[in-house]
Curated annotation (Swiss-Prot):
NCBIfam families: PRK00714.1-3, PRK00714.1-5. The gene is rppH. The keyword Hydrolase applies. Accelerates the degradation of transcripts by removing pyrophosphate from the 5'-end of triphosphorylated RNA, leading to a more labile monophosphorylated state that can stimulate subsequent ribonuclease cleavage. Its cofactor is a divalent metal cation. It comes from Sulfurovum sp. (strain NBC37-1). This is RNA pyrophosphohydrolase. InterPro entries: Nudix_hydrolase, NUDIX_hydrolase-like_dom_sf, NUDIX_hydrolase_CS, NUDIX_hydrolase_dom, RppH.
Amino acid sequence: MQNKKSYRPNVAAVILSSKYPEKCEFFVAHRTDIRNAWQFPQGGIDEGETPEDALYRELLEEIGCNNVEILGEFPEWITYDFPKTARGKVYPFDGQTQKYFLVRLKEEAQINLQAFEIPEFKEYTFVKYDELFQKVTYFKRKVYRRVIDHFIKEGLI
């Protein structure tokens, strides 16, 4: 008999800089715990929390700022498996099922990666669309492209 896979409910934020729409740049951050792993902010949904509530909480925890405007929400939950080398190391899950939001930093937003005791990220940058997929960790590229291309198709980016 095969074991059923388990997936962690999660939210993820595709963050556009406050310069959008004049300049289209995506926020990506370098994880503190994994070498060369760049990604979007994301995190688990706590019991009783809505995905939108989790989004605001996770942004505050991970980048020290939830001063954003929500521009869109991906219509589906996207599930992906962790790489085999990572499974079971941090969470007892095989992967994550994620709800993606497209957000824009407000003009007065201030990012502070040191806002919490144990920082999730050590540095961040803003990149253009064509640079994004070279920068982010390999196993997230397909999902990121699907989500961003959807937002582009919908006219949100």
